[in-house]
Each structure stands twice: as C-alpha cells, then as structure tokens.
C-alpha cells in the first residue's frame, strides 16, 4: 500500500511516500510554505503517479496551527478528487517514535511550544523496539518544564533547545508518520480530520456569506 505522509506541525515541513515499510522518496524544508510543490517533488523522485497513492497520513499536531490546517486541507482536497483513505496521527506520537529511532531511551518528556509561555507536554517510556505513553498530553507552564530540565529529565521537541539548555531539538518526520500509519486501519473522512489543540484557538472562522437580494 502506497502511503503519502504529510507532516507540517513544526517549522520543518516534510512529506514522504512509502510502499509498506520502504520509503520511496521524501523531502523536507525549513520555514517553507509549499504543499503541492513538495508533493510533486516527492512523487517525481519516486517515479510515482498521483493515482498510485492509496492512503494519505496527516500529522495532527499539536504544533503549528497554520501548518496543520494546511496539511488537513490538502488531504481533504485529495480525498475529494481521488477517494483515497485518510488517517490522522498525533505528531507527539511520531516524536516518541522518532526518539526511539534516535536511541533516546528511558523516561522522555515530549515538549512542543504552545505559545503564551505554555507548552504541550507528554511523557513516554522509550526503549529499543517500543515506546509507551506514561503521562497523557496536556498543557504545562514554562516554569514546570524549566524545573524538569534543571532536574536533568530528558526533554525533546521541535526547536525546544532554545528554551531549555539541556533539551534536544527533535522534529516530527513524515517517514516516521507513514510507518505509524501503515500499522493502522482507523481511516476517517476528510471532514473528521481536526488538529490536536488543547485550548480554544485564536483563529476564528469567517461567518457564512450573506446573500444580498
């Protein structure tokens, strides 16, 4: 099954095309805003036509609300045009899997900047071949993460090293996302895809258009 994985929840946006466990092609860019261009780049590298994609996996965050919304909109449009399977996966889960690949073992705090001096925090137990959630995702204050960092706890996350001196920068990766999706079958329709966001968003939807007669 060919899976197109789209991970836009951090500053490093990435897309990967997988066939089973094999990564056929992948591409990433830092600070970019391309979507279709990245997709076409990956498909071209893999020598694959759009019609060959059977499933699209989307990283649902938490993280960059704009990036996640863009990835969801892309997946929704693709499903409407080609009737592919869609699956959404937590970007924090992908970060835990990425930490496992990087041999970051033990109790690990996955931390993502939530703005306003708050952070998304989840704790995982990570060992070779497995990772398990110990503390579910929640919002935490800057002071709490700073205390954990000062106590020598392992902390990883996107661009988190600029906040906490002992923390390691780690980014969600589309190839990891695609491999996580391969083991899942909980496909959903595009209108059910929503970002993981633990507080009311500052983004407001525009009101419906009024018909002027």
Q: What does each of the following model-derived ranges do?
A:
Residues 37-39, 70:
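Short, conserved active-site loops that position catalytic residues or coordinate cofactors/metal ions
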Residues 55-86, 91:
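DPxDG-like acidic metal-binding loop motif
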Residues 23-24:
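Short hydrophobic beta-strand segments in globular cytosolic domains
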Residues 39-55, 148-153:
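Phosphate/pyrophosphate-binding loops at sites that engage ATP/ADP/AMP, CoA/4′-phosphopantetheine
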